[in-house]
């Protein structure tokens, strides 16, 4: 039986159902024994500030191309099957889901590594902009040095 391969990218304002996304990764996929997912959510604290929400913006068209390139690199490096990336944009409140990365593979090692790689590169290479609403006002956030360093470890 051949590896089940697919790539799906969704940039959306509406929330997603984690259980449904996992079920779609598993659907008609008897070859892959591993499904690894990451879900990022809006936290209520950042750098000592009380966060009340986020505004996420993106560069339409370019964001999807950037994510497709990141996934293509992951598919070259690891033996993975299906990949799904969902990233929300717009106004998000505390506890809401921001991002989903799901990866299937025959074995867990490839699925874990590819999932982490995709998320690390998404944080620094995909054109998203984040404005944080805090008890001290609103501010646009720059990419963190720690995110840059984490992504560079894959090079």
What do the PLM-derived regions correspond to, one by one?
Residues 99-105:
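Short glycine-rich or small-residue beta-strand-to-loop segments that form or flank ligand, phosphate
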Residues 1-97, 113-116, 120-155:
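N-terminal, polar/charged subdomain of small-to-medium soluble alpha/beta proteins
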């Amino acid at each position: 039986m051949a590896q089940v391969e697919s790539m799906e990218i969704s940039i959306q304002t509406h929330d997603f159902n984690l259980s449904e996304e996992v079920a779609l990764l598993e659907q008609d996929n008897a070859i892959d024994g591993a499904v690894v997912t990451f879900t990022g959510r809006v936290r209520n604290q950042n750098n000592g500030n009380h966060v009340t929400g986020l505004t996420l913006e993106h560069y339409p068209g370019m964001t999807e191309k950037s994510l497709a390139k990141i996934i293509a690199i992951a598919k070259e490096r690891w033996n993975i099957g299906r990949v799904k990336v969902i990233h929300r944009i717009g106004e998000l409140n505390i506890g809401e889901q921001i991002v989903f990365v799901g990866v299937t593979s025959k074995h867990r090692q490839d699925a874990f590594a590819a999932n982490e790689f995709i998320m690390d590169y998404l944080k620094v290479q995909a054109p998203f902009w984040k404005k944080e609403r805090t008890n001290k006002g609103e501010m646009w956030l720059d990419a963190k040095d720690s995110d840059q360093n984490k992504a560079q470890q894959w090079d």
